[in-house]
Curated annotation (Swiss-Prot):
Keywords: Antibiotic resistance, Plasmid, Transferase. This is Aminoglycoside 6-adenylyltransferase. Disulfide bonds: none annotated. It comes from Staphylococcus aureus. GO terms for biological process: response to antibiotic. The keyword Transferase applies. Required for streptomycin resistance. Adenylates streptomycin on the O-6 residue. NCBIfam families: ANT_6, ANT_6_str. It catalyses: streptomycin + ATP = 6-O-adenylylstreptomycin + diphosphate. Its EC number is 2.7.7.-. Gene3D superfamilies: Beta Polymerase, domain 2 (3.30.460.10), Nucleotidyltransferases domain 2 (1.20.120.330).
Length: 282
C-alpha cells in the first residue's frame, strides 16, 4: 500500500501539471489531529477546477492515481440521489488497498464550499493564492453538545414512544419490523443519552467519532459490554432480552443525565412499561 506522502505528492503533481486545476483540498479524518492515523483512512480530496466537464467527459485521468478496482459516481446515480448539489465526485478503490474520493468543484463555488465545510479541511495546493482566509483543520463541529432540558425530554420521549413498536413487533412475530425500530431509532437514542452522560463527566470539547466509534474509550469494560449485549438479536427471545436490557440502560443513563444536568426527570417509563407488560407480555 502506498504511503500518505506518496499519495499527497501524486495528487499535488497532478494539479501542477494541469492549468485547469487551481486548488486541491484534503478533507476528513486525515486532516484531524485528534484522530490516530492508520493506513486505512480514506483520502478525501476536493479539486477546484475551471471546467468540470473537461474531466467528466473523458475519465482516463483517473487511472493516473493507481490501478482501479471499483468506482462509484454518486452524481451519476438514479436510485441514490447525491447529497452534493454542486460538483461531481468519484469514489474509488485501488488494487493496493487505497480508497480515494475526489470531488470536482467549479472554482466559482469556492466560497460556498468553505461556507458549507465541516471544518476538516487542509489546503494542499493553491497555485494562484485564491484562498484568502487562514484554513486550519477543526473538528469542533463534531464535538459533543450539551443538551438543553427540552432536548433531554425529547430524547426520553422518543425512546419510550418507539419502545412500544419493538415490543409489538416481537409479540406479532414481525422480527424485521421490530429490529428496524430497535436498530434505527431505539438504540441511537440510547447512544445519544450515553454520549451526554460522557459529556457531563468528561466535558463537551471532543468527539466520540463517527457512529460513536470511540465511545468504548469513555466507558468501563462492564458498561461497554452491556451496550454490546444489546446487539445480540438472534431470534425473538434474544431480541426481546436485548430490548429489555436496552430499556434498563436507558433508564440508568437518563437518570444520571437528569442529575448531572439538573433537569427534571420525565418519568415516562412507568406508564410505557406497564403498557408493554399488559399488552405484549401476557
Amino acid at each position: 500500500m502506498r504511503t500518505e506522502k506518496e499519495i499527497l505528492n501524486l495528487v499535488s503533481e497532478f494539479a501542477y501539471q494541469r492549468s485547469n486545476v487551481k486548488i486541491i483540498a484534503l478533507e476528513g479524518s486525515r486532516t484531524n489531529e485528534n484522530i490516530k492515523k492508520d493506513k486505512f483512512q480514506d483520502y478525501d480530496f476536493a479539486f477546484f477546477v475551471s471546467d468540470i466537464e473537461y474531466f467528466t467527459h473523458e475519465e482516463s485521468w483517473l487511472s493516473l492515481f493507481g490501478e482501479l478496482l471499483f468506482i462509484q459516481k454518486p452524481e451519476d446515480m438514479e436510485l441514490f440521489p447525491p447529497d452534493l448539489d454542486y460538483g461531481y465526485s468519484y469514489i474509488m478503490y485501488f488494487k493496493d488497498g487505497i480508497k480515494m474520493d475526489i470531488t470536482l468543484i467549479n472554482l466559482k463555488d469556492l466560497n460556498r464550499y468553505f461556507s458549507d465545510s465541516d471544518g476538516l479541511v487542509k489546503i494542499l495546493v493553491d497555485k494562484d493564492n485564491l484562498v484568502t482566509q487562514e484554513i486550519v483543520p477543526d473538528d469542533s463541529n463534531y464535538w459533543l453538545k450539551k443538551p438543553t432540558e427540552r432536548e433531554f425530554y425529547d430524547c426520553c420521549n422518543e425512546f419510550w414512544s418507539v419502545s412500544t413498536y419493538v415490543a409489538k413487533g416481537v409479540f406479532r412475530r414481525e422480527i424485521l419490523f421490530a429490529l428496524d425500530h430497535f436498530n434505527n431509532i431505539l438504540r441511537p437514542e440510547l447512544l445519544r443519552m450515553i454520549s451526554w452522560y460522557i459529556g457531563f463527566n468528561r466535558g463537551f470539547d471532543f468527539s466520540l467519532g463517527k457512529n460513536y466509534k470511540f465511545i468504548n474509550k469513555y466507558l468501563t469494560d462492564k458498561e461497554f459490554n452491556m451496550l454490546l449485549a444489546t446487539f445480540e438479536m438472534n431470534g425473538y427471545r434474544k431480541t426481546y432480552q436485548s430490548f429489555k436490557l436496552c430499556c434498563e440502560l436507558f433508564k440508568y443513563y437518563s437518570n444520571k443525565v437528569s442529575c448531572l444536568g439538573n433537569y427534571n426527570y420525565p418519568n415516562y417509563e412507568k406508564n410505557i412499561e406497564n403498557f408493554i407488560r399488559n399488552n405484549y407480555e401476557n
